[in-house]
Amino acid sequence: MIRKANELKKSLEPELKGGIGTVRLTHFIDEHEAYGVGRLFGVSTIPPGGSIGYHTHKDDFEIYYIMKGIAKVVDNDKEDILHPGDSMICFEGESHSIENIGDCDLEYIAIILYTEKRRG
């Protein structure tokens, strides 16, 4: 199956997880097409000064791959800076947040996969 850019589902998430601003999501596939392995497969875009608030993953885990911009992340209370080409994994039971500290949009691939507990 081929999907052109204009066919991909897009959504807006204001103040995601208590963050600042509105995150734009472009979904590669829908959760229902993922055969029960996960719930997010796409590109997240955070405007300058925006963020996704600190939160904990339960029965799933998340992977980030930075494509554009500069991100300040908190990974289990440890702060770091990510640049294009960097990645981060927040495993089940762990916590994280991400903030755009650059002057252009922060774009990154975001994938949330279920753990065995969730897939049952």
At which residue positions do the language-model features occur?
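Short, conserved beta-strand element in jelly-roll/cupin
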Residues: T45-P47, T56-V73
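Conserved short histidine dyad/triad with adjacent acidic residue
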Residues: H27-E31, G42-H57
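Ligand-binding loop in jelly-roll beta-barrel domains
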Residues: E92-R118
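Short acidic-glycine-tyrosine-enriched beta hairpin
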Residues: D77-E92
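A short, N-terminal "cap"/entry segment at the start of jelly-roll beta-barrel domains
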Residues: M1-G38, R119-G120
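A generic "binding-loop/recognition-motif" signal
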Residues: P48-G50, D59-D60, K78, E94-S95, ...
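Histidine-centered metal-chelating micro-motifs
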Residues: S51-G53, K72, M88, E92-I98
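Short, surface-exposed secondary-structure edge patches
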Residues: V43, I63, D77-I81
